[in-house]
């Protein structure tokens, strides 16, 4: 086996262990924020939505800068620094008794993510061969789901005793992850050339097709982020106990572990990436619309199952499509910019979702936020369909001219 092949094989295992620690550390804390501050402390959902949206926007919106810096200086220093900053943010959350302190903790957490997330994504693109990426992203999603439910179960158990225990466990896991990267991650370059920061960012901004695709995905993310805000609140309201939230993540884990890889393997043989992304988004959108009308936990979990199935279909295709569109000369910059859709969609989804949830509750129209999210998903579906049809038309024109 050549040294390159050996490095790729070892890199896969490194990426899987690193991903497990990151997801565990995140899901021990974040799914319980809305339960802690909305249900236990009585804050308005929009206040918590601002905090979650701030974290999302900072982490993903500034991702292009983190990616461009990583293109210049390498992945290792960015990842280690970002992990430690995320740990500090989670620790601060444990003493948040005023909204501004929660916002500050989410700001720290987001800045940490800005540093470590783009280079980690770029390492996947660097180490995994193009024909294997779809399956590897599926494996990562399966691991995400299993780690998420373990993290949520651990966090829910700790919440029974003290929220500060929740906010101590998350930082410990991120410090462990920082040490793991500092010890084992080689000083790899992310791009084929050492790209100056400004050049990497400029290269991305000139790629109009990639920019349009990323910005359109904001609508997709408005729906996706509700697993952190409105869906846990809804499950808690219907069940009458925060412990029911862990079953929501258990459903996701079961579906991902049993369906994700088989669906990905089958669909990649029969459907284009664009079609898989759009089909998943359509299922997610349609499953959102009736959520506000249900009153039983069984009905709610059925809709959540449909939502997760849509995500299982869409997410590996979205990741693979984003990676395939990235320029190898500026991988970090591309993968950083690819998070901008999540920054915009996540911020609007959290803040707007929280505001609509409060508005629907006060107006006795609980279906309002869910119908709006479903409509946004349908419009995003149509916009993506138009973009992909334009791309196919341009390809046919080039083939005819040739």
Swiss-Prot record:
Residues 34-98, 160-164, 235-243, 298-299, 361-367 are periplasmic. Residues 1-12, 117-138, 186-213, 265-276, 321-339, 389-402 are cytoplasmic. Pfam families: MFS_1. It comes from the Bacteria. It is a multi-pass membrane protein. CDD domains: MFS_MdtH_MDR_like. InterPro entries: MFS, MFS_dom, MFS_trans_sf, MFS_Transporters, Multidrug-R_MdtH. It is found in: Cell inner membrane. Keywords: Cell inner membrane, Cell membrane, Membrane, Transmembrane, Transmembrane helix, Transport. GO terms for cellular component: plasma membrane. The keyword Transmembrane helix applies. The chain crosses the membrane at residues 13-33, 99-116, 139-159, 165-185, 214-234, 244-264, 277-297, 300-320, 340-360, 368-388. Its main location: membrane. The keyword Cell inner membrane applies. GO terms for molecular function: transmembrane transporter activity. Belongs to the major facilitator superfamily. DHA1 family. MdtH (TC 2.A.1.2.21) subfamily. This is Multidrug resistance protein MdtH. The gene is mdtH.
């Amino acid at each position: 086996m050549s040294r390159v092949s050996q490095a790729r094989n070892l890199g896969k295992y490194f990426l899987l262990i690193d991903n497990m620690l990151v997801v565990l550390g995140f899901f021990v804390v974040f799914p319980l924020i809305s339960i802690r501050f909305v249900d236990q402390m009585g804050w308005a959902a929009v206040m918590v939505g601002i905090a979650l949206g701030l974290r999302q926007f900072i982490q993903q919106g500034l991702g292009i800068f983190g990616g461009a810096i990583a293109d210049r200086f390498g992945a290792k220093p960015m990842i280690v620094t970002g992990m430690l900053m995320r740990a500090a943010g989670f620790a601060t959350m444990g003493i948040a008794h005023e909204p501004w302190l929660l916002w500050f903790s989410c700001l720290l957490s987001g800045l940490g993510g800005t540093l470590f997330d783009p280079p980690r994504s770029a390492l996947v693109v660097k180490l995994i061969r193009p024909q294997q990426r779809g399956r590897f992203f599926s494996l990562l999603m399966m691991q995400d789901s299993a780690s998420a439910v373990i993290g949520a179960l651990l966090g829910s158990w700790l919440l029974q005793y003290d929220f500060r225990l929740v906010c101590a466990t998350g930082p410990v896991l991120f410090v462990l992850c920082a040490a793991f990267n500092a010890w084992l991650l080689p000083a790899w370059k992310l791009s084929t050339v050492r790209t100056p920061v400004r050049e990497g960012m400029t290269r991305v901004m000139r790629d109009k097709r990639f920019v349009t695709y990323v910005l359109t995905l904001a609508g997709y993310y408005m729906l996706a982020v509700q697993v952190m805000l409105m869906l846990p609140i809804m499950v808690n309201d219907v069940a009458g106990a925060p412990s029911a939230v862990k079953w929501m993540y258990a459903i996701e884990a079961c579906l991902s572990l049993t369906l994700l890889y088989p669906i990905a393997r089958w669909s990649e043989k029969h459907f284009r990436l664009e079609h898989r992304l759009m089909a998943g988004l359509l299922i997610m959108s349609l499953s959102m619309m009736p959520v506000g009308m249900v009153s039983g936990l069984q009905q709610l979990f059925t809709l959540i199952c449909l939502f997760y199935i849509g995500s299982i279909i869409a997410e590996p295709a979205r990741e693979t499509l984003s990676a395939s569109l990235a320029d190898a000369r500026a991988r970090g910059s591309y993968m950083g910019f690819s998070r901008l859709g999540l920054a915009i969609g996540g911020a609007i989804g959290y803040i707007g979702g929280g505001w609509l949830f409060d508005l629907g509750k006060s107006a006795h129209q609980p279906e309002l936020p869910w119908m709006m999210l479903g409509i946004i998903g349908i419009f995003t579906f149509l916009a993506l369909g138009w973009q992909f049809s334009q791309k196919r038309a341009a390809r046919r024109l080039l083939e005819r001219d040739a």
